[in-house]
Amino acid sequence: MAVDTLWERAKYINGATFSPDGKQLMVFGSGNAFDNIGLNIKEGQISNTYDGQLFLYDPATRKAKALTKDFNPNVTSAQWNKFDGQIYMLTEDQDYQRVYTCNPANGKIRRLDLPEDVIYNYSLAEAAPVMYYYGQSVSNANRLYSYNTKSKKTQLIYDLSADKLKDIQ
């Protein structure tokens, strides 16, 4: 196996992970990464380098593609699911933290219909259509759920809110 430098002193790139097949990289950074290909601002505006964006990078061609250039929420983290090939993104949009999927083949982004306003974290199974996540909303504390990524069904696993708020009327 040979070692190759893909970037040197790459400004605005925060990290990267391999695709499930090992042929591409999912790159985290600001819209300024890769010579500004992720920017979606008017001329004369200054970019927000804290606005998290996702890119696909092909090491063979050394070409990058902006996945979330026209996507409004800020991407805070993402995971490329081995089971279904989708990229699952945790996002921030004002007071909400939601999970979206991105199809890396066509760039189509879809919000998961999850019952909480603030999703704190999630974990994906490698060999099954299962995601566990926890979050809360304005009227409840943390709850843990299971989500079937194929059927799109959510199941409440544990309601910490019931314990925390049991004496509140």
Predicted region positions:
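Extended amphipathic secondary-structure runs
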Residues: 1, 58-62, 77-80, 84
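Non-catalytic accessory segments flanking enzyme active sites
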Residues: 1, 15, 110-169
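A flexible loop/linker signature enriched in serine peptidases of the S9 family
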Residues: 1, 6-14, 27-55, 66-76, ...
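Residue-level recognition of a conserved intra-blade site in WD40 beta-propeller repeats
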Residues: 18, 80-82, 124-126
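Hydrophobic beta-strand positions that form the internal "hydrophobic ladder"
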Residues: 22-26, 86-87, 129-132
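Short loop/turn segments that connect beta-strands within beta-propeller blades
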Residues: 58-62, 103-107, 148-152
